[in-house]
Structures are given as structure tokens and as C-alpha cells.
């Protein structure tokens, strides 16, 4: 489940799904259409992201950075942070 508050997207599920990926994409597009240049993502409740959602997040971050925009992770659960560290993507994601 995804919650949007302003330019912040909260993934409310401990285990995100492919349905959450579709909702996340819609949320990102909605926030960008509203004129935001920065999107904040809260992963504090999430311990698992499907690879498709992670790939989308990384690809979208790269694309937005090329336009002077960004997606930033404001909070992350310890288990998910460990996965990002092991995959060596924490630096790219600004963690």
C-alpha cells in the first residue's frame, strides 16, 4: 500500500509487491505532474522490495538527476538498509 503526502511517498507494507510498484509509479508521476522537483520516499516500514520496484526507483532517480530533480529516501528500515549496503547501492541512493 502506498500513501502520498505532498511530495512524500510512504510504502506502508513490510513486503512491497508488484502492485505496490504500479502504485509507486503512479504516485511518482502524480507528484511530478504537480510540479515537484524532489520526491521523498519513506521505506521505514518496508523490509522487502521486489527487484522490479528497486530497478524502477534507481532508473527514475538517474533520469530525474539528469534533469536537476531527485528522488530521496528519507527513512529506511534496518533490514532493507542492510540489503542496499550488501548490493552496494546505498551510496547511489544517498543513504
Residue spans for each PLM region:
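Hydrophobic residues in beta-strands and at strand termini
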Residues: 11-13, 43
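Short beta-strand/loop segment at the start of cytosolic alpha/beta domains
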Residues: 1-11, 23
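Conserved catalytic-core motifs of GNAT/GCN5-like acyltransferases
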Residues: 95
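Amphipathic alpha-helical interaction surfaces in cytosolic regulatory modules
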Residues: 18-92
Amino acid at each position: 500500500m502506498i500513501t502520498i503526502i505532498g511530495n512524500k511517498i510512504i510504502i506502508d507494507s513490510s513486503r512491497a509487491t508488484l502492485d505496490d510498484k504500479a502504485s509507486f509509479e503512479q504516485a511518482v508521476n502524480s507528484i511530478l505532474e504537480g510540479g515537484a522537483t524532489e520526491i521523498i520516499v519513506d521505506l521505514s516500514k518496508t523490509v522487502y522490495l521486489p527487484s522490479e520496484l528497486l530497478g524502477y526507483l534507481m532508473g527514475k532517480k538517474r533520469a530525474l538527476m539528469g534533469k536537476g530533480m531527485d528522488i530521496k529516501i528519507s527513512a529506511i528500515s534496518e533490514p532493507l538498509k542492510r540489503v542496499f549496503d550488501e548490493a552496494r547501492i546505498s551510496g547511489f541512493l544517498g543513504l
